[in-house]
Amino acid sequence: MKTDFVQSGGFLTIDTPFGANDLLLDGMEGAEGISELFKFNLFMRSGSSSLSASTIVGKNVTVTMEVEGGSKRYIHGIVSRFIQSGYDVDFATYQAELVPSLWLLTLSRDRKIYQTKSILDIVKAVLGEGSITFSDKTSGTYTALDYCVQYDETDFDFIARLMEHAGIFYYFTFTSSGHTMVLGDAASAHISCAGASTLRFFPRTGQTNPIDTVYRFEFEKRVALKSATVSDYDFIKPATSLSGNNAATTGSGAIYEFGTGSATASESTAKAKIRVDAAQVTSTLLRGDSFAYALNAGTSFTLSDHFISTLNALHVVRRVHHTARDDLYSNSFEAFPAASAFRPPMVTPLPRAMGSETAKVVGPSGEEIWTDQYGRIKVQFPWDRDGKGDDKSSCWIRVSQSLAGVGFGALFLPRIGQEVVVSYLNADPSRPLITGSVYNGTNTTPVKLPDHQTQSTIATWSSKQGTAGNIVRFEDKKDAEQLYFHAQKDLLTEIENALTTTVIAGAEIHTVKKGDRTVDVQTGNETHNVKGTRTLDITGDETHKNGAKFTQNVKGDFELVVDGKLTITVTGAVQIKSSADVLLDAGTSLTSKAAQALTQQAGTALTNKAGTELTNQAGTNLLNKAGVNLTNQASVQLENKGAMIVSKADAMHNVEAGAMLTLKGALTQIN
């Protein structure tokens, strides 16, 4: 095989990790475009049939195109494939595929969370991690996103869809030693094409045309989308419209897009304009063929000498297909008027989270519950390699409840350490929603299963550092049904109207193990109806206080047994009335005392009787009176004593003694 050839002097040359003349570039074919990965197929030969693919695959290679007296055009990239395609007597043939370093991002797939970063910041971060050389020529302002997720998509697809969503395009510029990804969002990002800033329209004559000419140039007009409406929903401002619209002056049709992450109506309007611009740029197409090997996608050139004067203007190259063989070169290209606002088409699909997954509730160290005013929580996904399991691991995520109204509904907040079920609104990984909780090997069920599989339970846990909590438990076991309430501390029941408790059969027991029990009827009555017996067993004192009348009605016997003293104090009158007998029985003495008058009256007979001594005493007068007979009798001695004693009878007064009658005084008068 030949080994004595050199590259110098040819239109095509190549610089590879091999020796300067180990490979000879015979031909090249490939394409580059705005917001597209360029790819060039290289056709080469070598005097060596044993070139090692590992030496060149993944390495930088530069292709140079140059004609005598012309500028150099470089195409730089990395070799993604290297093929030994054949050989003959003199040479071995090889092929290689040249791609940008950005292509390497198509090989990496990940799940990754970005918080409080704008789309442009996220794109730059991914490019930086991938060691991609880029230049930022954007001029727009990009709002920080609360939450953005790369979800089972390549790094390239992730940033591609973000840029398409935001209207950011990219293209590549080249030097002999590298290539640069240029980011843009306006016409100002399109630089003038070096070596082809002005091209002449020069129809092909069959001869080799100059390198500054376009020999075919077509103009095409299409019907494109006219208007777009973009909208979203903000739960913090649910009544606020976030809809925005934009329309072109020409075109037809309308699209409606919901769930774009807009925080304001003006953001939606801006996004609607991006959608319309992306469609409208296709309404005017310019196609051409040329020998201008310097044409570079994303750059601009001015066309001159066209017979349609309106085409002699500034245009931007959207796409170029290059073909070179030995010293021959031509290209075909697409362009659009520089006055058009280019936006990349939305071709990269949004990944869909079809279904649910679980995550762990997280928060700051030392906290057991972490939430905001809307009852949102934060989680750590098991796939998130960057999260630290703290309050920075995710955005605030809303929690689905069984009922949610204006100041009413259900509210159960998942706590730090619990495993929750995460679903996604519209299957968008960047819009998570907590829809439930699940038990696991650490967070076990509140009842032992399957032993108590008939029990349904709501059990909470005291915070902080609690060891138990409140419980509502339903036991549905046949013939052992039970509804159990446990308050870890206080149980407060507040009822706006009536409370009815009915015990069909069985007992009702109230037990206060320690503390007081108070029944406070502030307005209204209290009624107790007991068809059986009622027992009050009080170890200490009992006090009854009535602000008004107190009445007890007893149909049977009423018995009051007092082990100590019985004191009845009445500010008014006291009346004891019995249809039968009244017995006052004192073990020692019985005293009837009145501040003024004491009257004892019997319809038939009144007997005051003492086993030893009976004393009737008055401070002034003592009157014993009977309608018929009055008898004062003593078995031994009856004594009437006073400063003055008067015994008087209207008819007859009989003073009689069975043995002796003694009347004695300092002065005794019998009249």
Regions found by a protein language model. Name each.
Residues 1-112, 165, 283:
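Assembly/oligomerization scaffold segments
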Residues 41-51, 280-291, 346, 403-409:
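Short alpha-helix capping/helix-loop boundary micro-motifs
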Residues 55-56, 295, 389, 414:
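Short, well-ordered loop/turn sites that connect or cap secondary structure elements
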Residues 71, 87-88, 117-134, 140, ...:
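Extended, domain-scale alpha-helical bundle/helix-rich regions
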Residues 99-101, 116-137, 258-270, 364-392, ...:
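Glycine-rich, acidic and aromatic/proline-enriched surface loops and short helix-turn segments
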Residues 183-184, 356-633, 637-641, 645-648, ...:
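Structural signature for extended repeat/solenoid scaffolds and their inter-repeat hinge/linker regions
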Residues 297-299, 308-359, 433-441, 445-456:
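Acidic, low-complexity/disordered segments
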